[in-house]
Amino acid sequence: MGTWNVKKLLDWGIDYFKKKDIPESRLSAELLLSSVLGFSRVKLYLNYNYEPTRAELEKFKMLIQKRLEHIPIQYILKEAFFRRIKLHVTQDVLIPRPETELLVEEALSAVRSFAGDKMINIMEIGTGSGAIAISLADELEIEDFHIIATDDSKKALEIAKKNAQEILEKDKSDRIDFLCADIIPKDIEFREKYGYKIDILVSNPPYISNKGFDCLPRQVREYEPKRALVAGKTGSETYSRIFEQVKPFLSQSSFMAVEIDDLVSGTVLEQFREVYGSQPIIKKDYNSKDRILVAWIRKDAPLRSSGK
């Protein structure tokens, strides 16, 4: 075939991935070659005639082989993009999805509803890589806020802490407490400190059923952490526990946004009503599927949703 250049490598990689039924063949080839050469994807196309070194060719070949095993690109490159940040990720954490960015949008919007001189306490349950908590700290335009981010995996928390330290300025990373807990820390000190003081609750909990897990794409099923995906027999088990356990910690006027799946949205709505006695709003994602449950919870008045 002669000398290899960027164009030939891309064309070969895309065609090879298509023949092997690798999802997003073009994107996979572009990202892998971009990583090897240290180019942006745009720069690849501006440097079609660049001829990689032998070492670069060998590295590209190695990454191609990993992708053929259906290992997600994010795990191969150990990085994932979420809103305006780049996160370090491993197989100990779920790869953040674009739909989850909607949770951040809802929380940022809710913050504007609180008085300007109030300290805002935000809790995220199931932080994983820290994508949501770090994005909130990065994008919040107020100074008086504190974020508590919990996860039941110590390895995930190590990654989240590392991401916060590398992405955020110290004054912002210091405002996030990463705590090991299934949902809510059980120690008395935490309960005394945050009882009735959480203003905003966000969570992207597991919501896949046991049977649903078997139907997931191979690259998800074999490589992403099952504990972060599967909730149980129905897929809705985690929500009822979240709703019940966070209730004593919510402030007098608090906001909640949790990610859901359209297969469990009806059940989750009923679980919310049973705990809080009111009706939240379900918002759609980019594909018009039920994706985010949002609600204002006022303990001295009927619940008001944040829906438009």
Residue ranges and their predicted role:
Residues 102-215:
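Conserved SAM/SAH cofactor-binding pocket of Class I
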Residues 294-300, 308:
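C-terminal lobe and adjacent flexible extensions of AdoMet/dcAdoMet transferase-like proteins
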Residues 233-296:
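Conserved Class I SAM-dependent methyltransferase catalytic core
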Residues 1-60:
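A short N-terminal interaction module
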Residues 206-237:
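Mobile active-site "lid"/loop adjacent to the S-adenosyl-L-methionine
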Residues 17, 111, 164, 168, ...:
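Conserved hydrophobic residues forming the short capping helix/wall of the S-adenosyl-L-methionine
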Residues 35-110:
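Conserved AdoMet
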Residues 32, 70, 100, 132, ...:
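Residue-level signal for inorganic ion chemistry
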